[in-house]
Amino acid sequence: MNFASNTLEIAVPPDNPARITSFADLAEDGVKVVVCAPQVPCGSATQKVETSTGVDLTPVSEESSVTDVLNKVTSGEADAGVVYRTDVRTAGDKVLGVPFPESSGAVNVYPIAVLAGSKDTELAQEFVDLVTGDDGRQVLADAGFGKP
């Protein structure tokens, strides 16, 4: 069973000096964009969006984690970075999130299940029920996760 989803979002400095409003803006001349390396999930998802849109990004840096991407944006080394919506939410007022509709082509969906070999299947099922119940879904939504 899937319990949550996460989509890409563009992280920009709070004042958005490069005036980024779309994924295509990231390919404009002079825009310094940072992405995750292709072997990390956020990098793979970014490549998927590039392929589906025909927008070719020329990043100034490919990082090994979303934290590193966010650090480049918050330090002023980049005008924008492509990360997950949840990462933008976690960063608080350090960045502004710019959603873009093309991210729907690269949604990460997260599964949850009680393992067959679990030592305490009853407790495991209670946890699954908590995460997938109303309270769990609200906590996930508050963190920026979407419905599965």
What are the residue ranges of the model-derived segments?
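Exported/periplasmic ABC-transporter solute-binding proteins
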Residues: 4-148
